[in-house]
């Protein structure tokens, strides 16, 4: 459970945290230069942020370049006949144990997960187990778990847990532009590169020296390989801020299906008009999209939702209202928290 403990940050602390989230590969000197701070100030603040878990460093593997065909979002509405904790104990063993799932969150009457997969067969198996398990527990009423498939070749992921626009708004700092996160550029790895790749994904904070000792190769080789992975975007580092310390209380999940007679122009990226600063995840195909946003309070959520609905209706992009679910971050439980290691090892095996 995410007990919200809001912490007021100083002006310097806001700049450093924003700098870390926006530039997770940057060193203290680079952040200091960007914001006009002393390097020693940045170093001291970063050290405290690490010790007090203000953020978590995550290495996101670009598995679309190594054989993964799709990202899949699955969401479910539950009949809350058993307590959330008991449901999670059951699903952790039977469903969340699947290598494909890297993020999963649940509340009493709903939940969703996000996966990478080599093919649809793997996802189909997970969903069959999910439906069977929930059905036996009498957790499902009329609706089956709903899956939204994003094949990398025909999808665009504009934001993938990108907290930069959100922090820009919260801290009143100028924001940078978005980038498409999962461009497909097929690549091959040597046996040694695969070992280093998996180690970085599993332990993003581990220094090259320790990776080298663990794998039995030289520190120089590890450093060279890691630099290559980061420069050619085989791995993208993300810094995920601590929701609790930012006072974020509401997570909103949107599934929007577009009117097939008048969808937004996919090639011209018209759908980006829906983006606001609170949206941290935004994936789309030609006729549907998934968005996830975070808010401090109900007013912020309501205003952001109203803007999205106004835009959808104004453009006549929808024939019926989207599916929108809100999660209280005081009550919700993150079941799987950005664990990319199992699916990385499975894809690269």
Question: What are the residue ranges of the model-derived segments?
Answer:
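A compositional/biophysical signature of low hydrophobicity enriched in polar/charged and small residues
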Residues: 1-349
């Amino acid at each position: 459970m995410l007990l919200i403990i809001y912490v007021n940050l100083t002006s310097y602390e806001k700049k450093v945290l924003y700098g870390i989230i926006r530039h997770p590969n940057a060193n203290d000197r680079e952040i200091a230069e960007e914001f006009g701070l002393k390097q020693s100030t940045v170093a001291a603040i970063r050290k405290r942020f690490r010790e007090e878990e203000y953020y978590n460093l995550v290495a996101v593997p670009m598995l679309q370049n190594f054989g993964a065909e799709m990202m899949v979002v699955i969401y479910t509405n539950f009949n809350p006949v058993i307590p959330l904790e008991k449901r999670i104990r059951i699903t952790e063993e039977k469903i969340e144990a699947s290598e494909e799932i890297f993020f999963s969150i649940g509340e009493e009457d709903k939940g969703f997960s996000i996966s990478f997969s080599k093919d649809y067969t793997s996802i189909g198996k997970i969903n069959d187990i999910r439906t069977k398990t929930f059905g036996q527990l009498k957790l499902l009423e009329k609706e089956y778990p709903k899956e939204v498939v994003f094949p990398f070749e025909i999808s665009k992921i504009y934001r993938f847990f990108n907290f930069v626009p959100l922090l820009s708004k919260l801290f009143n700092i100028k924001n940078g532009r978005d980038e498409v996160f999962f461009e497909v550029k097929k690549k091959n790895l040597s046996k040694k590169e695969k070992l280093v790749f998996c180690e970085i994904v599993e332990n993003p904070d581990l220094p090259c020296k320790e990776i080298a000792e663990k794998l039995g190769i030289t520190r120089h080789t590890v450093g060279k390989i890691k630099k290559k992975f980061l420069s050619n975007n085989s791995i993208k580092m993300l810094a995920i801020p601590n929701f609790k310390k930012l006072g974020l209380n509401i997570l909103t999940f949107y599934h929007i299906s577009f009117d097939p007679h008048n969808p937004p122009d996919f090639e011209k990226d018209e759908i980006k008009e829906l983006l606001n600063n609170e949206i941290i995840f935004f994936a789309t195909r030609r006729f549907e999209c998934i968005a996830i946003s975070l808010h401090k309070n109900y007013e912020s959520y309501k205003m952001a939702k109203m803007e999205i609905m106004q835009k959808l209706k104004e453009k006549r992009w929808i024939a019926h209202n989207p599916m929108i679910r809100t999660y209280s971050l005081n009550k919700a439980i993150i079941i799987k928290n950005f664990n990319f290691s199992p699916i990385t090892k499975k894809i690269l095996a």
